[in-house]
Amino acid sequence: MGTVQLPATPLCIDDVNTYAKDLKIPNFVGCHMIDLLPSKSRKKECGIVNLESSSEKGSHWVCWYKNGKERIYFDSYGEPPPPELEVYLKTKKELEKSKLCIKQSSVTVQKDDSSECGSLCLYVIYYLSKGYPFEAILNVLLNRYRKPHPLTIHNV
């Protein structure tokens, strides 16, 4: 078992997919642009998505984690999930009733001048896949936001 220090620099799709593979994140369905999400959601999965379409160069990485009925969305700026991801994660009935069923953060854990959103997403889905509570992961990231230090994953 070792540690992996995630970069504070921008990551491309290939970088994210390589880190996810190296970290052995279970049920990872890949890194996608918002218009190229998988065709169907699985019962247990996680992934990372860029908020721009495939015709654009990319702007910001966000992620989701799904384990049965539990669905979690993470944006390092605390923004709500984009409509495309809500459609992907919710059932037809939940969409029709505008049901709030995706747990999400509303806190900012990334500085405006930072490009580490991809690394933050990898950190979140890695620890969610290990069974850590979302709130505990957010607390670690909030403390790091207040006192910046390298983003390190332990016990890989």
Q: For each predicted feature, which ranges?
A:
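Cysteine protease-like catalytic core of ubiquitin/ubiquitin-like
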Residues: 46-129
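Hydrophobic transmembrane signal anchors and adjacent membrane-proximal interface regions, especially
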Residues: 31, 100-107, 139, 151-153
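General structural signal for secondary-structure boundaries
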Residues: 2, 8-15, 83, 132-134, ...
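Cysteine protease catalytic domains with a Cys-His-Asp triad
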Residues: 1-62, 66-71
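Generic detector of well-ordered alpha-helical segments enriched in charged/polar residues
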Residues: 13-21, 86-89, 138-139, 150-154
